[in-house]
Amino acid sequence: MSALTKASGSLKSVDYEVFGRVQGVCFRMYTEEEARKLGVVGWVKNTSQGTVTGQVQGPEDKVNAMKSWLSKVGSPSSRIDRTKFSNEKEISKLDFSGFSTRY
């Protein structure tokens, strides 16, 4: 299957948790901004364990770009030690209409 076919026909969903210095550094705001730029949907929130967690859905190539951003970039003041992805699957439709911060 060509990359073009995969990009246009396949929707993905993935859960994530980001570890490191990711709270109190505008991580959620930058995550929401990046998601909107890429055109993916889902959510982000702080956890009581000091991590940031959430879910991303969208075309496979856009979800992969967001995974890369969550693993390597983050907000300017953040320090990402590691990012754990789970429950990655192909979906038939999006569960969200936008990207939001949860509290």
From Swiss-Prot:
Domain Acylphosphatase-like positions: 13-103
Protein name: Acylphosphatase-2
The keyword Transmembrane is annotated on this UniProt entry: no
UniProt xrefs under InterPro entries: Acylphosphatase, Acylphosphatase-like_dom, Acylphosphatase-like_dom_sf, Acylphosphatase_CS
UniProt GO molecular function: acylphosphatase activity
Coiled-coil spans in chain: none
Family: Belongs to the acylphosphatase family.
Main function: Its physiological role is not yet clear.
E.C. no: 3.6.1.7
Modified residues annotated as N-acetylserine in this record: 2
Root EC class: hydrolase
Highest rank taxon of the organism: Eukaryota
Active site location: 28, 46
Keywords tagged on the record: Acetylation, Hydrolase
